[in-house]
Each structure stands twice: as structure tokens, then as C-alpha cells.
Amino acid sequence: MRVLGIESSCDETGVAVYDTDLAGSAALRAHAVYSQIALHAEYGGVVPELASRDHVRKLLPLVRQTLAEAGLGVGDIDGVAYTAGPGLVGALLVGAGVARSLAWALEVPAVGVHHMEGHLLAPLMEDDPPQAPFVALLVSGGHTQLVAVDAIGQYRLLGETLDDAAGEAFDKTAKMMGLPYPGGPQLARLAEQGTPGVYRFARPMIDRPGLDFSFSGLKTQVLMAWRDSDQSEQTRADIARGFEDAVVETLSIKCERALEAAGTNVIVVAGGVGANKRLRARLQQMAERLGGRACFPRPALCTDNGAMIAFAGALRLQAGQHSPPKVDVTPRWDMATLPAV
């Protein structure tokens, strides 16, 4: 089954073709992402109306490009998957409208996919994928969650952020220190030049019971350190390193506790922050110490993309799950309400 996947929940337009007749990573026939970073840079954040308009301009050309790279014609598609939520309502409607129109014209089934389920399942596209049960750390600009995965479509929320998501904290901290948009990746690169231990910030909520997170206090602590410093380039790098170390250690500690609570030793990491090199190394070490595995998607599939939507949609389409023939999106959507596959 060849499934066309469309992602348009925020500021990236993603399209992919996933072929269930192929094995492992080869099943991803083609994928392409158009980023709107340059469009939103002057505003310091995503402008929803501009995001929607840019999806309108870019989506169909990206569909044509992806099909060409896969060596397929539009008539070779057996199903269409699209992000139905959560996300920006206007951006979601663009992707849903194109997807439903293609499915109707081709007379093939379509299914709306939960954006975070797409992220959660992205590591399963790689060779030697993990098998449920496992714990997933979903860590991005909009979400920081620990989820127990009992089976595909059977999810239990173990903990989540009470304020800023980890990726949001990266972005806001970078902005406070004058780094260009988008700040998170810039801050991570800057941290490579920092000296560990020069600045040591709190590891939020690790001394409390439960698996929830909080990063707003850490962000304030970094702001105060930056304001009181000489604000030199080396100091900026040292503060960035101290901040990154605090976030990575906090996430690692909570992940280990989540594994114990769920009774497994397999951790799956997905979302934009999942591309962070230091986080990957730390969780890999933790999993090996526990005799388990840490599984990640390739870095290109950590950020928003159509591949994860095509894959998650293929699983549901193969299970006979289709969405009603109407353009409908869910900007706020609890993943625990999803049906099992």
C-alpha cells in the first residue's frame, strides 16, 4: 500500500510517500519538507495567517516533487494521510483540504493523523524498530510528554510539562540571549563551545514525586545569570552549555523513572529536541546501563515532516480505519482518545 502523507500543522510543509510493501527504512520512498523559518524570522515566531498562506502556495508543488522523487504518478497512490491535529487551525485546514480533495479525486481512503502520534511512531520507520511496550519521550517546541505505549494506539500519559515545553524553553532562552530565530538549534550549537560546569542551573522538579516537568523557572534563572554577566561570547556559550546540561539531565532522570514505572527498559525519543546530540548520548547511556534500548528517528525526521504522517496513516489505513469524507480538523486533541490499531 502506497500512502501519501501530508503535514501542515505549523510552519513546515511536509509531504512523503510510504510503501508498506517494502521493508525497514526503504519503505519511505520519498519525503520533502519546506520550512517557513525565513518567512517568520522577522517576527521572532510563527504568524498563523502567514503560515496558512504559505502552505497554500507550497503544498501542491511539494506533492508533485515528492511523487516524482518516488518515481510514482498520482494514480499510484492507494491512500492519503494528513495531520488533523493538534496544531494551528488554518494550517491544518490547508493540509486536510488538499488531502481530502486528492483522496476524493483518486477514489482512495483518507485518514486524519494525530500529529504527536506521528512523532511517537517515527522511530518505528527505522531498521530494527522497537516493539511495544515502551516509553516514549515526546519533546518538541509545543510538547514535552512521557507516554507509556502498550500497543499502537494504546497510550497512557505518565507526565507532561506544567508550563513551557523543553523546545519552547530552548527557543525563549536563546531569544533572551540575543540569538537569531529559531533560537533552539542556535543555542544547542553555541553550547558546544561552552565550558561545562561554569554555570550550573537547577534541575527542575527532580526532587518531587511524579513525572511532570517545569522549565519556566529554569528559563528565569538563565535570564538572571545572563543579565548579571559580562555578556561576552564565551559567557554566552557557557550559559548555553549550563542550560542545555540542565534540560538534558532533567529529561534523562524523568525518563529513567518513567521506564521503572512502566516496567520496560526501552525508551523511544521523538520531536524536534530529539535531534539534540547531547540528549541522544545521555539517553543512550542510560538505556545501556539498564540493559535496554534508546530508539530515535534519523535527525531529519525529528522535526515536523510528512514521513511520520504517511507511516502513522498507513498503519491505520491497513487496520481499516478511515476518516469521514469531510474536511475536519482538531486543533486540540488528546492522544489518549485515539482508537487502537
UniProtKB/Swiss-Prot annotation:
Class of enzymatic activity (EC top level): transferase
SUPFAM superfamilies: Actin-like ATPase domain (SSF53067)
Cofactor (UniProt): Fe(2+)
Cofactor note: Binds 1 Fe(2+) ion per subunit.
InterPro entries assigned: ATPase_NBD, Gcp-like_dom, KAE1/TsaD, TsaD
Record flagged with keyword Isomerase: no
The protein's name: tRNA N6-adenosine threonylcarbamoyltransferase
